[in-house]
Amino acid sequence: MYKYIWILILIIFTGFTSCNKPPKFSDDDSLKIAFSTDTVAFDTVFTTIGSSTRQLMIYNNNEENLKISSIRLEGGNQSQFSINVDGLSGYKFSDLEIYSKDSIYVFVRVTVNPNDQNNPFFIEDRLIFETNNNEQTVTLTAYGQNANYIIANQEIKGFPKFKIIADSLQEVRWNAERPYVVYGYALINSYGTLVIEPGTQVHFHNGGGLWAYSDGQLRVEGTQENPVVFQGDRLEDFYADEPGQWDRIWLMEAREGHGHSIEHAIIKNGFIGIQAQCFEKTNRAPLNIHNTIIDNHTGIGIYTNLYHIKASNFVVSNCGNYAIALTGGGEYIFEQGTVANYWKKSTRTTPSLFFNNTYQNPFDGNLYAYNFNFEMNNCIMYGNQEEEFETEFHAGPDTTYIFNNSIIRTKRIDNDTNYYKCLFNVNPKFVNKELNYHLDTLSPAIGLGNPKYATGILQYDLDEVARGNNPDAGAYQYVPIVEE
């Protein structure tokens, strides 16, 4: 009996010792590792701001285990790239074991050093791998972009952190030489003016925005060829259509004769495109919006509170809440515009267009009702909700709204005096309802407009196509395709 027990113990011990034999690694120089790519490429990256992380996979497709004797950045510790190998950060790693049919993760980032160039510049490095005296490389590339950095340095209770970029009685101009990258809010102080010249690119970090305080002035002076663009500060392709990357353009009341103006701008991928609201007093100067696209905001495209707006040749598209919310009363004229809300990032339960005439005073907290007057001419207001128009008016003040020669998605057709020569719940037939709001061949918006609203600066559409005597509804005039 004891004899068999000792034999069993010996067998078990032999099994354990055989299991604990160290793995063997081949030194055959004909065996090589493989990679998921031969080049890790980054999109344009602002100097001093780190990039997102790229992933590189190392594969051992051989039947034998291998030992990578060295992984290193050719630029060493001076490289603008950084790597993380299996959870460890550094610029050089030694003796990494990779078993047969196994893999190793390598994560790569880049932080570009600033220089004196205005245009994007190319940087490059190499990852060098040595295995059994074989040297293999993976190229790392990126484009760096110098920028003007605006970093918030002041804070007042109840307001976001900000930096004054145009102080009282000061006119500041931003130009297109280098992009502007804003952390926090860039603030235009009372009686200050910011002029943004054609082609300027303004990028906001998460939560950042542009803020014109009471009696300050913003003038955006883009052109058809060189619009001014407001967007987030992540330049990778992944973020190109990602909403909610920054906060908003926030415009308080301007002084008479010095109203805000936005011409040829693209405002995209924020929380609110434009928030225009009275703060200390009733607005005395209109906000003029012309030839401007406001697209892809998680909240609202245009949000107002007791304001005066004239908007023309505009597109407001794809917003997670209202496309346009005009609240607290005010005076509004919208002409030759397209509101197209086909938001798909989340469930939208609000209409594209909302009106009310009540305003909560920020100082005494009381709710007040004000006059509300709205006019929409030669426009399209459509979306993927069955009801895209809602009002909430308190009795007392004058409240009027009228739509002329427009396409509207609504069931609120309860008063003929509010609508003149409009089409209801008729698909406007865009070229692409999510991406391209030009009119398709069979669009009912073709010829729907009234020529009296297409005069002056509105003789030409958002693409500077002449409308002639038969204008279409919306921001874009239909142009027939000429077959050769």
Residue ranges and their predicted role:
Residues 74-92:
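Short, solvent-exposed loop/linker segments at beta-strand-coil boundaries, enriched for Pro/Gly
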Residues 4-13:
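Sec-dependent N-terminal signal peptides
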Residues 134, 467-471:
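Extracellular interaction modules
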Residues 20-25, 33-44, 49-50, 93-435, ...:
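Beta-strand/loop edge motif enriched in small/polar residues
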Residues 58-62:
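Asparagine-centered strand-capping/turn motif at beta-strand->loop junctions
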Residues 51-53, 63-68:
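Short acidic/proline- and small/hydrophobic-mixed sequence motifs that coincide with surface turns
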Residues 15-18:
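C-terminal motif of bacterial Sec signal peptides marking the signal peptidase cleavage site
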